[in-house]
Amino acid sequence: MGRDHGLIRTERLDRLALRQVDSGFRRTPEQRADAVRRLARLMELSGGIYFGDDAASQEQLCEASPEELRALLTTVRFRCTLRVYRFLREGLQRYPLSQMRLSKPLSGDRWRQPAKAPVVLKPIEGDAHPFPIEIDLPPWTVARDVDFRRWLFGYGADVVIESPQSVVDEVSSRAKQLTGLHASSH
């Protein structure tokens, strides 16, 4: 794996091969415990196992106070249909609750929200995608995490992404590319 001091990185197992043993690098028990602590924190903040490629950014997030963390994370905001909203509100384990904000249910919905669920956003009555959801994530997750992007984009037309603008632009570009591909193949 990489030689960047302090960088935590994961790789696909099918790409893993032992080429040579580097016996010159040994961590002390304290360094190992610190790396394990940072790994756990990065997994919590990222909602996955992709941690970007910059050790300094990782360290900054791991050591940030709650106030500093808010400024370092990127908010992804989207609105969704009832079908996706029901699915997401029942599966709140993917991202830390402290980094999520969900829509309140529409009037007449008999769903009993869990006590700790961050249900604070106001739904948009009469809209096809009335349920806003916000998730605060590290910038590298939003920009390059394949699993996060597959999760978000996988809902297709059941989700309208509102921010950040870079993700809105990417969805628009992908839609145009797909439309062009399918239109030209007929």
PLM feature spans:
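Flexible linker/loop signature enriched in Pro/Ser/Thr and Pro/Gly
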Residues: 2-50
